[in-house]
Amino acid sequence: MASSPKLFSMSILFLFALFSMQIHAREYFSKFPRVNINEKETTTREQKHETFVPQTTQKPEEQEPRFIPETQNGYGLYGHESGSSRPSFTTKETYEPYVTPVRFHPDEPYNSIPESSNNKDTYYYNKNAYESTKQQNLGEAIFTEKGWSTKENQNNNYYNGNNGYNNGEKQGMSDTRYLENGKYYYDVKSENNYYPNRFDNSRGVASRNEFNENRYNNMGRYHQNQEEFEESEEEFEP
């Protein structure tokens, strides 16, 4: 009988110690934050569904504000934004140079001649482009032989052939050296060049009138100075 109350008291003490240990354990673990396993799982699952968008992949329109010009015409080429509209003109891709139409003559020295020549009866040039078909450039033969003479006819130029310095032909109607029936005769060779001119006297007209004081007298024709003939005229009686 004596062992039963002892045993009862021991069991009561054991139960009391057990409950007191549970109370102290709760107080001890209450100091640490509680982590619920169910809440962890829900948070991780929610993070998997979220999509992370970096800032670099965002559109530039959202990053920078759109610039609007103050003018109504806008900016860029021809008042439009670059790339918004094409220019109003079109450029030709192929370029063909201008070529003068020519025809070739293998027999002629200059074989490249334009088809259209300047011919309106004023200045027409022949195919060789040197000599005129119409007598525009008369050269040295402009007047008659007794006026402005050519180079081939040197009857009255500088030296007058066999007649010494002067030609003994009759010099026009006013020449009084030869009259009717040979009544009057004048020795032409007696004029021994006493005049200050170098080659011919004042009566003669040299080529181009280069050495006469009476220069360009009546367009180079052989008109004589009547005053000098009146002084030197001699009468001859047969």
UniProtKB/Swiss-Prot annotation:
The keyword Calcium does not apply. Keywords: Cell wall, Secreted. Residues 40-51 have a biased composition (Basic and acidic residues). InterPro entries: Prot_E6-like (IPR040290). GO terms for biological process: seed trichome elongation. It is found in: Secreted, Cell wall. Its main location: secreted. Residues 40-64, 210-238 are annotated as: Disordered. GO terms for cellular component: extracellular region. Residues 227-238 have a biased composition (Acidic residues). It is predominantly expressed in fiber cells. PANTHER family: E6-LIKE PROTEIN (PTHR35274:SF2). This is Protein E6. The gene is E6.
